[in-house]
Regions:
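N-terminal Sec/SRP start-transfer signal
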Residues: 1-35
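Peri-transmembrane interface segments
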Residues: 16-24, 236-291, 300-302, 311, ...
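Amphipathic alpha-helical repeat scaffolds
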Residues: 33, 289-295
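Juxtamembrane alpha-helical signal-transduction segment immediately C-terminal to a transmembrane helix
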Residues: 40-43, 47, 51, 270, ...
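Membrane-interface junction motifs in transport/secretion proteins
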Residues: 44, 48-78
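A structural signal for hydrophobic secondary-structure junctions
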Residues: 84-209, 214-220
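Mechanotransmission and gating elements of multispan inner-membrane complexes involved in transport
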Residues: 173-275
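Transmembrane alpha-helical interface segments in multi-pass membrane proteins
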Residues: 298, 307-326
């Protein structure tokens, strides 16, 4: 019987008073707001995953840096202890320093990373080579991989198949213990050949270059166990926070152990804030539309009190409902 009454009112001629118009507009707003919320958050999640994948190509799962100064000492025994920790896949030792990079008359300031042979196992940079190859040479015959932004800035040729000779770049680095009275003693110069170009994201491509760690140590006068950082890749099943805590306990207070999210905190915080802001705005729109719907239904019930009274006098139960617009 309920369905028969509902079908009769459904087929009846619709009224076009203000209450019904407001009700249908509200329904439309709720539907559109919900669809927009799902669509925008889906797009934002996809964009967030893309940004994370790009930054993960450069930032490793865990990075160890000194709590004071630019370098720290890590003995072979300490390094072996790190490698033996559960969940660690590979460890690469790194020297980072600002350097002047010259190609003939062109020059630019870069952050030069000296890395060891394990770097290919911890970083995604080797997979982002667009010209040449990821080859860093050795201390006596070093080669360098430059970012695409640096390549454009100083016109670096790193392609051995181009028919033109690969660029020989001059690297100027600060030297430990250089005389302050004589500026020339505070700097060291070395030549290296361009072997490849990587492209990840503009922030990295225009700032970072990568070369052999022994070459940088030789130029800067660093000891065999001195490093700027240790970059670590974990196994797929490893617990990132658990490994971070274990390494912090192992190394002590003289070292900072950061996850890939902590290495670029501002980026991830900004992305989270943007996501929650979008969610809050769309939820507010949805809440306002919902309140409008409740108000419209309340006015609709008041408008149809006569119809409800007639149905009740005919023996209808209170559970009978009359749909909007009848």
């Amino acid at each position: 019987m309920n369905l028969l009454f509902a079908w009769r009112y459904f087929k009846a001629k619709k009224s076009a008073n203000a209450i019904n118009i407001i009700a249908w507009v509200t329904v439309t707003v709720i539907a559109v707001a919900t669809a927009c919320q799902v669509l925008v958050l889906s797009v934002f999640n996809g964009f967030e995953d893309l940004v994370k994948s790009l930054y993960s190509s450069f930032y490793t799962d865990i990075k160890i840096t000194p709590s004071k100064g630019k370098t720290f000492t890590l003995t072979p025994d300490q390094l072996q202890s790190i490698k033996q920790q559960a969940g660690i896949y590979a460890v690469s030792m790194v020297i980072e320093e600002k350097a002047l990079l010259q190609n003939a008359d062109a020059q630019t300031i870069v952050i030069l990373k000296g890395v060891d042979s394990n770097y290919v196992h911890v970083s995604g940079v080797p997979a982002k080579i667009i010209t040449g190859e990821f080859n860093l040479g050795n201390a006596d015959d070093p080669t360098i991989v430059v970012g695409s932004g640096v390549q454009e800035a100083i016109a670096v040729n790193a392609d051995s198949r181009s028919g033109s000779p690969q660029s020989i770049l001059t690297v100027v680095l600060p030297k430990r213990g250089g005389g302050i009275s004589d500026p020339t003693e505070a700097l060291s110069e070395g030549n290296t050949k361009a072997s490849g170009v990587f492209a990840i994201q503009q922030d990295f491509d225009s700032k970072y270059d990568i070369t052999n760690i022994d070459f940088i140590k030789q130029q800067m006068g660093l000891g065999p166990d001195e490093y700027s950082a240790s970059e670590i890749k974990l196994t797929r099943t490893a617990d990132l926070l658990a490994v971070q805590q274990e390494l912090s306990k192992l190394l002590g207070a003289g070292y900072i152990v950061q996850t890939k999210y902590e290495q670029n905190t501002s980026l991830y915080k900004t992305m989270r804030l943007e996501k929650w802001f979008i969610y809050a705005v769309l939820t507010l729109i949805l809440a306002i539309a919902t309140f409008n719907m409740v108000s419209s239904l309340t006015m609709l019930v008041l408008e149809k009190q006569k119809d409800i009274a007639v149905l009740q006098s005919m023996g209808a139960f209170l559970s009978f409902k009359i749909s909007p617009g009848k």
